[in-house]
Amino acid sequence: MIFEKPEDLERERNAIEKFVSLFGGSYQKLGQFDIDFKVFDKDKTLIAYVEVKGRKKDMSNAYPLPISLEKVSKLVGKRLNPVVVWACTDGIIYGKVYELTGEVKWGGRPPREGSVNDDELMIYYPKQKGFKYLKF
C-alpha cells in the first residue's frame, strides 16, 4: 500500500528540483518500489541516485534526520554517488551517504493500517560536517 499524499509528492518534486538546480541538471523518477530518482548533469550523464525524505520541520529544527536503513541499503546498492535529500519546510538538507555517520536503532512512525514497515531499523543522522543546505 502506498501512503504518499499529493502534498508529499509535491514536496519531493520541489526538493529534487532545488537539488538539480545547483548544477543545471535533470532527474528521472524511478519506480514506486525503487529509490526515488536518477540524477543527470547538464550533459545528460547519469551522476547520482537520490532518495528524498520529507521532513515537516524547519532545517534548524530537523535533527536528527531519519531514514529507513533499508532505503539507505537500496540507495548504496546503486553504487553511483548515493545522496539523501531531506525536504524541510524552508529548504533542503542533503549529503552523500558515504560521508555521513548516523545511529542505527529500531524506530519509525506510528503504524498505519495496511502498512507492514512503519516500525523498522532506522538511521538517525545528527547535525554534521557532511551535510549541505539550500533554502527554498
Predicted features and spans:
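Non-catalytic C-terminal interaction segments of nucleic acid-processing enzymes
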Residues: F3, S21, F40, A87-F136
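A structural signal for short, well-ordered beta-strand segments and their strand-loop junctions
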Residues: K29, Y49-E51, V83-A87
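Generic structural signal for beta-strand residues in well-ordered domains
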Residues: L30, K42-D43, L75-G77
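Short acidic/glycine-enriched loop/turn segments that link adjacent beta-strands
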Residues: G31-I35, G91-I92
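Conserved catalytic cores of phosphodiester-cleaving nucleases, focusing on short active-site segments
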Residues: F37-D58
